[in-house]
Amino acid sequence: MSEMTLNAAEQPIDELVGWVKQHDFSLNLTTERLAFLIAIAVLSNERFDEELGEGELHDAFAIVTRLFDETGEASAFRANNAINEMVKQRLISRFVSEITDGASIYRLSPLAIGITDYYVRHREFSRLRLSIQLSMVADEMAKAIEAAQKGGTPGHWKKNVYGVLKYSVGEIFDQIDLNQRVMDEQQQSVKQQIADLLNKDWREAINNCEALLSETSSTLRELQDTLQAASDELQTQILDIQEIVYGDPELEFIEEALFGLQMKLDRITSWGQQAIDLWIGYDRHVHKFIRTAIDMDKNRAFSSRLRQSIKDYFDMPWYLTFADAERLSDLRDEALVLRDDEVTGQVPMEVEYEEFQQVNDELSERIGDMLKAHKEQGTPIDLSVVLRDYLAQHPYTHHFDLARIIVDQAVRLGYSESDYQAIQPDWKAINEFGAKVQANVIDRY
């Protein structure tokens, strides 16, 4: 979520609606008007001062109208109407300059820049752009860490740490998030291309579909590798600043900024793996469709073409590529035994030989009793308290296995309303060895 969205979310909806109504905000861009706005943006970028005269706007309108000949001729009257519409919708700003003898000059508004920037600059999402943005973030974070280590007055923290985190690092994170959304659109475009190919002639489309699928999969994996490599460094930098400001009430605003950056970093990182997982599912779906189409081919066109290719092999040689991977063996055991590492001290016999199912049943009964009490009395269940109390009764080497079982039982028997409101809980300690858990209280049966 961008900083602007966060600020807007803090205001009541009725107040925002009233503000929009009071200023009479509205947008109505037909395809021709959008093309005109993009033409203005392109011409503005070619100018040093990014200012255009009325004659230049008329020229841009004439260029657009030639491509939209069905809408009418490019008269000065229609051009002026289009310009006035843009001004009314706050897409361009009009100024009267005495230097130009009262002639008007025009500049794009921030709203128009946002619209045209999407269409002009964000049509491609490349690994190079992502790498540069991540490198810029790392440099800005390094500046913030250096300033934090020096310390100083509240003004120093506000300007050299908070300002860098919020207005530099945060905005670059927002740009990365925007670019990821562009990549989402590109995936949808590839899916549409594949659908069009399969609908026209699936036999001829197989090779093209495979190329589109492989290219997109490769791009996603490269982007994820780039994200993963950079996110580790960024995570370390965020933790370094958190360690410096921890426990200082005067620097609470720094912690809030870091929390916002942490959420953005988590979202950016998780997007890559999620996009890969979704694309793998789509890839399988397409291949399943092609296999089904081959099996249901009444005319046996595919098999006929294959036989003909074999027959003509010596005249037109070809290569056959096939995959013959070894089958993976499933070594999972449904009745896992708890780890039996050697520990200092005496381990109770009932725990040392306790099996997974026994522990599972005991925890299920314990959490079930808590949920029953919650149902009758409305008392929420703090999973961190449950973990801390239960793990304190067992050796340290068993803590990981036991914690996994407790969480598994908890999510089966109850859930938290906060999870559906996207509320991120705090980390809480669950043992004396530094282990922590992040979970909302269970308040729904």
UniProtKB/Swiss-Prot annotation:
Disulfide bonds: none annotated. Interacts, and probably forms a ternary complex, with MukE and MukB via its C-terminal region. The complex formation is stimulated by calcium or magnesium. It is required for an interaction between MukE and MukB. Belongs to the MukF family. This is Chromosome partition protein MukF. Residues 213-241 are annotated as: Leucine-zipper. The lineage of its organism: Bacteria, Pseudomonadati, Pseudomonadota, Gammaproteobacteria, Vibrionales. Keywords: Calcium, Cell cycle, Cell division, Chromosome partition, Cytoplasm, DNA condensation. InterPro entries: Chromosome_partition_MukF, MukF_C, MukF_C_sf, MukF_M, MukF_M_sp, MukF_WHTH, WH-like_DNA-bd_sf, WH_DNA-bd_sf. GO terms for molecular function: calcium ion binding. The keyword Calcium applies. Pfam families: KicB, MukF_C, MukF_M. CDD domains: MukF_C, MukF_N. The gene is mukF.
